[in-house]
Amino acid sequence: MEMLRRNFFRLLMVLVAGCGLIASPANALVEININKGNVEPLPIAITDFLQGELAQKISGVIAADLKRSGLFAPIDKGAFIEKISNPDATPRFEDWKVINAQALVIGRVTQEGDGRLKAEFRLWDTFAGQQMLGQQFYTQPENWRRVAHIIADAIYERITGEKGYFDTRIVYVAESGPKNARKRQLAIMDQDGANSRALTNSNDIVLTPRFSPNRQEITYMSFENQQPRVYLLQLETGQREVVGNFPGMTFAPRFSPDGQRVIMSLQQEGNANIYTMDLRSRTTTRLTNTAAIDTSPSYSPDGSRIVFESDRGGKQQLYVMGADGSGQTRISFGDGSYSTPVWSPRGDLIAFTKQSGGKFSIGVMKPDGSGERILTTGFHNEGPTWAPNGRVLMFFRQNAGAGGPQLYSIDLTGYNEQLVQTQGFASDPAWSPLME
């Protein structure tokens, strides 16, 4: 892990109090209450960072991140009156207020003598005439996009009061080829679709990739050698290993919150039950024991409870149990069937796929089953995954016809549904924790 941090990221954030980049008092006027649902996006001016093409690319990614969140409306640069030539100078606030820029971002990117980039920015509340935030970062030039995502996260958090989610990655199943002979391989990308690369390269079917809590491993299911098995993949080295050598099919894996166990389904004699495997001792523990199909387990953030799907009542429904398998209780009672549950990182909600009336929906409910809300419905929506701040979901959608699945994101309130750009067809997304 330390090698990965040294060789890949090489990134250091410095809060520069000594250079005057100090956050203003907490009573600045600019704020967004993201609990209100369909909020009006905040007009924000994001100037081209000085100096050069790379600096402008960084400010462009920042603007794209904030716009995609649905909470910010970057103002067209053609409307800017003041042309920033000195990021250290106090802006002419009247020039920004007249175009209704309630917040202003200015910045600069320079190259140090050792080759590193130095990226710095300031966030201003134009109507209060106060600086809200100022930071600077050092990184290797190849990591410029990550710096942009980190700055966007800082702006998002300062204005909304919630952690951002832009400095994250998505692992997913990349699909190519005709529908009746589709090739599926694991791929990974930034949350905005950039920096995509394949993690596997074979004709074996792969499904349900999931990140470890430290983002260094992925667990997934593969049909390698015609035997469905759960695997672990080390992202840094590419090394793979089978999680247990069981006589039956293993599938639907997911890490425990502490990363020490993998929970999964094991199919034997026509039914499937939920097991955990300790990754150090390789010992397994059986958690369910029914003649049904119990699958898609997901831990609560504190690791004390597990939500899963089961058809023990005749059709797929959601159940919650203790981490030791105790107290198995059904929580879904609406029309239709429920599947692919996943617990929110905040612990307050469970997202799911619901099939009813010939359509598939993505929804959320509280862990006791109350407060069910459908966020989006279509021909085939499936496989929700949470952003690490628990405010945004990603899922995949298959439309009717000969095309393939695509990834979409949607706000927890059901607004701001957006297509996530990928190089080809994509399914089974999983959101990483925030990078460090």
Swiss-Prot record:
Q: Name one GO biological process term.
A: cell division
Q: What is its main location?
A: periplasm
Recorded hits in Gene3D superfamilies, A to Z, give: TolB, C-terminal domain, TolB, N-terminal domain
| Pfam families in the record | PD40 (PF07676), TolB_N (PF04052)
Subcellular location(s): the record lists: Periplasm
Its keywords, alphabetically, are: Cell cycle, Cell division, Periplasm, Signal
In the UniProt record, the signal sequence range is 1-28
The reply on keyword Cell division is yes
Q: Which GO terms describe its cellular component?
A: periplasmic space
Quaternary state and interactors: The Tol-Pal system is composed of five core proteins: the inner membrane proteins TolA, TolQ and TolR, the periplasmic protein TolB and the outer membrane protein Pal. They form a network linking the inner and outer membranes and the peptidoglycan layer.
Biological role: Part of the Tol-Pal system, which plays a role in outer membrane invagination during cell division and is important for maintaining outer membrane integrity.
> Which PANTHER family would you find in this protein's record?
PROTEIN TOLB, PROTEIN TOLB HOMOLOG
Cross-referenced NCBIfam families: propeller_TolB
Membership in a protein family? Belongs to the TolB family.
Instruction: State the protein's name.
Output: Tol-Pal system protein TolB
